[in-house]
């Protein structure tokens, strides 16, 4: 199964990387990382994201966000599920407005027109009325809005447990089995 992971410019890029680490084991993964995500990651970690990705993810196919001719820009390429995690408010707004000026937003437009699974891990707080309205409209079109919110019922003990819960919930939405947190009995 072909899955596209987009990581867009906001804090918590490391959650996208943790998701990528888990996806790489279970599916054919294609990844687009926006310039904003790279800048956020480098500001938070003092490391270059491109170098880390090339070393860590050998099976993942990476595309530049400005490469509008890339295979994932076409519905005929066969991406079955798309997730953006984290998803910036800017990316959310572009998807809502149908603006396809980057590879990531084009790939989301394809997911919408092809009626494929599209999940947005919107990472912002507080949320404006406009962003809430955009999420509501996208949800009414079948888009799954799945912000990175944790729950304490899963036996959370530390930050890694919180991150595992969030990534595990995203994997659940993608119908990918995992052992990142204890399921509710």
Please annotate each region the language model reported.
Residues 1-119, 124-185:
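A cross-family phosphate/adenosyl-ligand binding-site feature
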């Amino acid at each position: 199964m072909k899955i596209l992971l987009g990581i867009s410019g906001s804090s918590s890029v490391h959650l996208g990387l943790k998701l990528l680490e888990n996806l790489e084991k279970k599916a054919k993964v294609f990844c687009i990382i926006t310039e904003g995500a790279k800048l956020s990651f480098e500001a938070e970690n003092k490391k270059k994201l491109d170098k880390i990705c090339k070393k860590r993810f050998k099976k993942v196919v990476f595309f530049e966000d400005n490469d509008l001719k890339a295979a994932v820009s076409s519905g005929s390429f066969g991406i079955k599920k798309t997730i953006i995690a984290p998803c910036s408010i800017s990316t959310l707004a572009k998807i809502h407005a149908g603006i396809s000026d980057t590879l990531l937003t084009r790939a989301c437009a394809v997911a919408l027109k092809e009626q494929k699974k599209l999940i947005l891990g919107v990472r912002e707080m507080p949320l404006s009325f406009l962003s809430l309205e955009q999420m509501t409209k996208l949800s009414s079109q079948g888009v799954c809005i799945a912000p990175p919110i944790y729950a304490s019922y899963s036996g959370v003990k530390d930050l890694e447990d919180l991150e595992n819960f969030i990534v595990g919930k995203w994997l659940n939405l993608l119908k990918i089995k995992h052992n990142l947190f204890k399921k509710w009995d």
